Amino acid sequence: MPTILGQNQYGKAENRVVKITRDGATHHIKDLNVSVALSGDMDEVHYSGSNANVLPTDTTKNTVYAFAKEHGIESAEQFGIHLARHFVTSQEPIRTARIRIEEYQWERISASDANSQFIGADEVKHSFVRKGQETRVTQITYDGSSWEVISGLKDLVVMNSTNSEFWGYVKDKYTTLQEAYDRILATQVSGRWRFNWTDDEQRMPNWEKSYEQTRKHMLQAFAETYSLSLQQTLYQMGSRIINNRSEIDEVRFSLPNKHHFLVDLEPFGLKNDNEVYFAADRPYGLIEATILRDGCEPKIPVDLTNL
């Protein structure tokens, strides 16, 4: 045979599921985008077209919605674990399941002063507004014996309006950038972190608390680091997470440097004391790195888009 089959997988991508949990008059929302990828004994469907080992992708879609009812959605990670375990243990030909989930965050809408007196609460218990552009993500991979859980976020935009410098860099005949001793530092964070929970015998992390605390440490490190380079800030963000979250062994960030350039106001007879900037959307510097707990091996892909 002149050709052979290489790596392959199949499943149903981007199953949008919204789960409403009703606690009396108070409602809670989980809004997920779930993608299922299955692999295993799938040679014949490629070579001969035999579907004998194929679980239809429509069935994987139906499973996502059924599990939202049967198991609920405590967290994106826990929901993905339920799905991955089911596909591997219930279908003999399937040896590995990879579940990717994006979670969209919602927060309650505050009631007006007059209405809060009427309903006896500061928030409307069934009304929500989508929170910014930040998206929570997770990927769960299960091969029947071990787990890999990589979680994170994307599109979290942050800015320091001072306490950032950039100087002392290499200069050649093409360098025009002026050294900066007080600049805006802004980025759109894409980050992933890998948990050291890999076995059912281990104690499972509290996924919701872990995400909340990891995000907190990441933002605090960004805010509290007097930055001489975005690389330095990135390293401090990852180190803060690993030093404070024992369940995480590896962090990877991709941070575009959202450049803000001082506008020359002298033609208008005005002085610009680091107050008026032009926000450039492209081109941008792109800073990427992995931070590891000492003694651990890197496993998060270098290109986060390949997760």
Language model features with spans:
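N-terminal intrinsically disordered, cationic/polar leader segments
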Residues: M1-K216, Q220-L307
